[in-house]
Amino acid sequence: MYTPLKPLLLAMSMTLASLSAQAAGSVVPGAGSILQEIQPPAPPLQPNAPSLTIERLGPEQLPATTPFSVKRIEISGNTAFDTSTLHALVADGEGKTLTLDQLDDLAARMTNYYHRHDYPLARAIVPPQTIQSGIVHIEVIEARYGRIKLDNNSRVVYSLLEATLAPLQSEQIITQAAMDRSLLLLSDIPGVVVNATLTPGTADGTSDLLVNTAPSPAATGGIALDNYGNRYTGRVRLGGNLDFNNAFHHGDLLSLNVLSSGSDLNYGRVAYQGLLNGQGTRLGAAYSTLHYILGGPLAALNANGTAQVVSLWLSQPFVRSPDANLYGQIQYDHQRLRDHIDTTATQTDRHTDGWIASLTGDTIDTFLSGGINNYSASWTAGLLGFDNIAAQAADAATANTQGVFSKWNMVLSRLQRLSQTDGLYLSFSGQWANTNLDPVEQLIVGGPYSVRAYDMGAVSGDAGYFATIELRHTLEQTFHGQWQTVAFFDSGHVTVNKNVWVTGINDATLSGFGIGLNWAGPSQWTVKADIATPIGSTPAEVSSNGSVRAWLLIAKNF
């Protein structure tokens, strides 16, 4: 029997199957794009900083004397810097008549030079001496480690903590960089709180390093409610995460994440990573699964799909310090994606195998009033294959995404301090590709993580960027918590297809501005709210559901 609905459904399904690859670039969700939407940008790493107390010896107290002639200054005890470098710091004192206090000031120049160049406990002194022929002797004491003692009260095995401190050895000159790296790597270990003290050693010129490790909570986590979903799989979402710190006593981390909008979207991920050595090298593995059903305007299609991702990675901190950090990671991802339209029995099943090499880092500087920089760069090389002949043929006749692909991604941000209460935040994210990409690899623009004036996943493409400027003002803290107001401007541009295969518009630009309010309350409650409206003309290919878009996130950590 003839029913008018069937031709309509067939036309809608054909449109859905090809829309993600067309020049319009508007995103009708599938397994690939939804998988990207539910994974927000990774926040900057903020590990617990170790507590370090330094107990210094007081300055040498020598009796005052009358001025005397200084013809030459001799220096001894230095090994980190050559004598000529240190002598240049005090050479202007030669050929003058100086008091002992003035000689101490000359020695302090060398002390400060050592401190500025990573030797926090080194000092130069004018020892008791008999001045003959105007020759004054300045002695450099390059502080060395005496005892290095570890008092482990955490649940991490002693051998792993000992290996992390192994680069620091008795009789070794104390340098700030080496000490910072070892103590920060200790503090990076899940389940560990680090307290360290440097005390004067028993031998002259030595300091003992006493390190105490205490346990941190065995489990941490949080729950969050937001409206960050898209209109096809449900806007309101509830998510949660649970981390088991040091679950097997080897500095390991077991993480569980879930996210759901009800029956239309369900996502779960389990990940485990552990330390391989005392230098912060980590090996990790993860498995995630996703199931979706399209509703709203596309409910009649009975469209649904799944995604499964298996990941393996190896990471290494190359630089670890309070003011600069650099991490490297190599990751392998195997993704299986399934998009089905049951009404027309259309199936698009595919898989990808990809390798990702990435560098991530941060720096703190004193430019203007000071700021924090975060950056990351990654290169992905992969292979896409289809699991059914019909989907493979459709791809070959259109976007031709099957086969080898590669892409570059970059993220840059800076938080500039303007005053005690004001800050300026700048960020840029970009992607470049060598060929047409599957939606799971494309750049998505629109939503709370990019251009907030547009719906989640408004446009997508093989290449593009989005950038943000935010002016943040922190209000006076009250017993109700800390409030922060935000004014922002977002803009993004997408090139839909690297290799154009269909006539029509192949790019889109989205811009918008808005205001926001952030709240950090007691008991680790946080709220983030943004309201934004588009600027300029909205691309015709982008669906519009109103001129104002609002985003809300409510979270509770424990």
Question: Language-model segments: which ranges?
Answer:
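Periplasmic polypeptide-binding modules associated with outer-membrane biogenesis and secretion
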Residues: P4, A24-G229, N241, V258-N266, ...
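Repeated loop/turn-to-beta-strand initiation elements of outer-membrane beta-barrel proteins
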Residues: V194, A219-G221, F248-L254, G278-L283, ...
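Residues that define the transmembrane beta-barrel architecture of outer-membrane proteins
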Residues: G205, G234-L238, D264-G268, T306-V310, ...
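Transmembrane beta-strand segments that form the barrel wall of outer-membrane beta-barrel proteins
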Residues: A219-G229, G240, H250-G262, G268-V270, ...
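Membrane-embedded beta-strand positions of outer-membrane beta-barrel proteins
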Residues: G221-I223, L242, L254-V258, L283-Y287, ...
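Transmembrane beta-strands of outer-membrane beta-barrel pores
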Residues: N227-G229, N246, V258-G262, Y287-I293, ...
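Transmembrane beta-strand segments of outer-membrane beta-barrel domains in Gram-negative
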Residues: L275, R282-P439
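C-terminal transmembrane beta-barrel domains of outer membrane proteins
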Residues: A396-F558
